[in-house]
Every structure is written in structure tokens, then in C-alpha cells.
Amino acid sequence: MSTVFALANIYKSFGRNKEVPVIVNATLQIKKGEIVALIGKSGSGKSTLLHIAGLLDTPSSGSILLNNIECTDKTSDKDKTYLRRHFLGFIYQFHHLLQEFSVLENVMLPQIITGKSKSIAKKNAMEILERVRLQDKLSMPISQLSGGERQRVAIARSLINCPLIVLADEPTGSLDNNTALEVFSLLQEYAKEKNIAILLATHNYSLAQKACRIVKIDSGILRSYSIDESGFNKI
């Protein structure tokens, strides 16, 4: 199966003189439809790596390959915005939904931004909201939803443009374990059907074990593990 997303020798450092390394020569390839779990302690660089992968932060060196398009520190903001809108989906622990918009309006938004008509965006949003079991809450304000329902809206919004890959940063971190597994199963089911890859940063080992493989980040360095590899539960 073809690679749809890759990080090549990503290095990121902070500090006045860039003397504090956060990501050290990270290389990762993700195939179409593959789910990769990114685990590591708080402060290990998971969120920084996802921000770089999502073209929201620029690496000190290295490149990102998305749909056979190479992105480096020389890639323009305009090109990055285009790639984000057309090829990437994002889910965060704190969902960044628009509180003043309804469920339906939140999910329609990515399609409107990428040029779809309101009628098409509404049709597609209603279809995907049915898939995440929110068809009876289309006009409800976000503020009236439960935590699990809000994350289902976030999942629907991340998937509506059928991205190549969804970058999920602790997407169920604020939910209890049963709700987290239920919400992630909805994401996993739709992604599998549409062959969408997922890079999942999580502290939840129950979720991590649903991935195709595990990548651990430790002091900015990536190490890969298979799901059934001896000692995984000790990572």
C-alpha cells in the first residue's frame, strides 16, 4: 500500500540560540489507511510533532511529504494552508468547535472553506453526522452537548473533506475510558471504510492497541513497536 504521509529527518529546537532539541531527526512513513499511535510522556514532544506534521509549525530542518508534495521551511504559508484544507484532518482533546454555531454548521464549515456550495456541504454534513449518530442534534448548539457528543462532532468535521490523514492529538483525553473507546471506534470505522490514515497521539493504551503499530517518542527520538511486540505494555 502506498505511503501517503512521511516525515523525513525532522529536527526541531527551541531557545534563543536553538540550543534545546525537542524533536531529533524524526523519520516516519504512514501508508494509506494505516493507524499509527504516537505515545510518550507529557513534554516528550508529541504535540510538537503533530503540529509540525499538520504544517502548523515549521521544523528547524527536515521535510514533510504529503500526497507526494514535499514541504520544508521554504514552503509558503499559502501552500501550507491549501494542503491543510484539502489533505489533512485535525482532532484535538479540546475540540475547538465554534460555540455559536450549531452541530450542522460546525461540520459544514470545512466544505464551505474549500469552495463547496452550502447545499452540497449541508448534504455531506448530514450524511457524516448520521454516521457518528448525531442526526437528531443537527440544530443543537455545541454548548448543550455532552463531552462525548462534542468529540463526535469534531470527528465528523475532521473527516468531511475525506483527508488523506487525520492528526488526532489526545482526541479522547477528556473522556472516560468507555466513552473514549466508543468515540474512537466511530473514527476508526469511517477511516477504514474511506482508507484514511490516522496519526493518533494518546496516553490511552486501550486506544493505542487499536492501531496498526506504535511509535514511542522519548526525548524527541522516535522508536517503532508492533502491537504484539513483547514488552509493549511496559513502554
From Swiss-Prot:
- What does the UniProt keyword field contain? ATP-binding, Cell inner membrane, Cell membrane, Membrane, Nucleotide-binding, Translocase, Transport
The residues that hold ATP are: 40-47
The cellular component terms of Gene Ontology attached to this UniProt record, alphabetical and capped at eight, are: plasma membrane
Q: Which residues form the ABC transporter domain?
A: 5-235
Cysteine disulfide links: none
Gene3D superfamilies hit by this protein: P-loop containing nucleotide triphosphate hydrolases (3.40.50.300)
Spell out the subcellular localization from the entry: Cell inner membrane
* CDD domains documented for this protein: ABC_MJ0796_LolCDE_FtsE
Q: Which Pfam families match?
A: ABC_tran
- In terms of superkingdom, the source organism counts as Bacteria
Alphabetical list of SUPFAM superfamilies matching this protein: P-loop containing nucleoside triphosphate hydrolases
The membrane-topology field of this record reads: Peripheral membrane protein
Q: Name one GO molecular function term.
A: ATP binding
Q: Which InterPro entries match?
A: AAA+_ATPase, ABC_transporter-like_ATP-bd, ABC_transporter-like_CS, MacB-like_ATP-bd, P-loop_NTPase
What does the record give as EC number? Answer: 7.6.2.-
PANTHER family (alphabetical): ALPHA-D-RIBOSE 1-METHYLPHOSPHONATE 5-TRIPHOSPHATE SYNTHASE SUBUNIT PHNL, LIPOPROTEIN-RELEASING SYSTEM ATP-BINDING PROTEIN LOLD
Tell me the function of this protein: Part of the ABC transporter complex LolCDE involved in the translocation of mature outer membrane-directed lipoproteins, from the inner membrane to the periplasmic chaperone, LolA. Responsible for the formation of the LolA-lipoprotein complex in an ATP-dependent manner.
Which family does the record assign? Answer: Belongs to the ABC transporter superfamily. Lipoprotein translocase (TC 3.A.1.125) family.
State the oligomer form and interacting partners: The complex is composed of two ATP-binding proteins (LolD) and two transmembrane proteins (LolC and LolE).
Name of protein? Lipoprotein-releasing system ATP-binding protein LolD
Species this protein is from? Ehrlichia chaffeensis (strain ATCC CRL-10679 / Arkansas)
Gene it is expressed from? lolD
